[in-house]
Amino acid sequence: MSSKKSAPGSANIAQNRQATHEYFIEERLEAGLVLEGWEVKSLRAGKAQLKESFVMLKNGEAWLFGAHFSPLPSASTHVQPDPTRSRKLLLHAEELSRLIGQVERKGYTLVPLSLYWKQGRAKLEIGLARGKKQHDKRAAEKERDWEREKQRVMRRG
């Protein structure tokens, strides 16, 4: 059975599925994005990718790097769009200071998880994450295979 695609204009824009495979997500946060007009139009059209993106903390601010927002030919006629430019993330000061402490002292990393609409504004879900080792990935894959096999047996029996 194929899964349904999200309807145009739905809340979810893009997801970083690779993040859950590569990292243990320990905490999830919502951040706003500073965008240009052509980027908003691209997001409305669903032309965004988070696959190679990452979040960095610089000078007490959070920045999204490597996210690709494909420019629409009709929306970016008077500007030179940069699809992979760095975008500032909007977080509360106490959230930022807590994240800076955990990233610098405890060895966590910040990973973009999904991009979605909330009350007409684009939001980015970021995860405070710890990297998985190779054996952790293998264990997670075995667990998924076992769950799939259990479901198969339950359907037959």
UniProtKB/Swiss-Prot annotation:
InterPro entries listed in its UniProt record: SmpB, SsrA-bd_prot, SsrA-bd_prot_CS
Region (Disordered) location: 128-157
Biological processes, Gene Ontology terms: trans-translation
Composition skew (Basic and acidic residues), residue ranges: 137-157
Key words of the record: Cytoplasm, RNA-binding
UniProt keyword annotation of Cytoplasm present: yes
Pfam family, one: SmpB
Subcellular locations according to the entry: Cytoplasm
Cytoplasm as UniProt keyword: yes
Gene Ontology MF terms in the entry: RNA binding
Bridged cysteine pairs (disulfide): none
One Gene Ontology cellular component annotation held by this UniProt entry: cytosol
Family under the similarity heading: Belongs to the SmpB family.
Record's function text: Required for rescue of stalled ribosomes mediated by trans-translation. Binds to transfer-messenger RNA (tmRNA), required for stable association of tmRNA with ribosomes. tmRNA and SmpB together mimic tRNA shape, replacing the anticodon stem-loop with SmpB. tmRNA is encoded by the ssrA gene; the 2 termini fold to resemble tRNA(Ala) and it encodes a 'tag peptide', a short internal open reading frame. During trans-translation Ala-aminoacylated tmRNA acts like a tRNA, entering the A-site of stalled ribosomes, displacing the stalled mRNA.
UniProt name for this protein: SsrA-binding protein
Source organism per UniProt: Methylococcus capsulatus (strain ATCC 33009 / NCIMB 11132 / Bath)
